[in-house]
Amino acid sequence: RDCGVWLSLGGFHERGQDWPTTQRIYNCHALLDPTGRLVATYRKTHLCDVELEGRVTMKESSFTNPGTEIVAPVSTPVGKLGLSICYDLRFPEISLALRHAGAEILTYPSAFTFPTGSAHWEVLLRARAIESQCYVVAAAQTGRNHERRTSYGHAMVVDPWGAVVAQCHEGPGLCYAEIDLDYLHRVRREIPVQRHRRRDLYGTAAAAGAAAAA
């Protein structure tokens, strides 16, 4: 309210109605408007269960329930905002679903570990921006969490062409970027991937892949 700004915040640990029976929280991304009103919330759908031998072990599903829906993009003064969280970044399906629903900006508040962040963070953010032709805004936790984990930091903004237009580093910091929707529409006009998508094929391939994985 004091600054008159929108805030994209996450992830918050939220107790849902199922807390008494599951004893698991939801990892929640909240969007507030300049009056402080809660405009939208998204519960993280992809949980980070990974094991990097000798480096990182995480099992988010041991204390977290997965969300069950993708939240429709929210209209803001700078464009239509899509909400995701951290590990969701590894799944292009959610960014493409948000783009299909009208998103112009994708937000990923995150806490990548140092091993995964140094290898994948920028690559994934640029990939999501290029394939969706959206701006990607990714806040990032930084610093030492405990003796076994350090967060990577490097909060970043990527434009629809895939260029990094603003970036922090490992320590606490703040960066700014202009959201130019005219430029976004130009990129989409010049490379019209939405018109070229073969949705008649993707469902068949996904079903075959799911059957093979099972």
What does each of the following model-derived ranges do?
Residues 180-182:
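C-terminal accessory region of radical SAM enzymes
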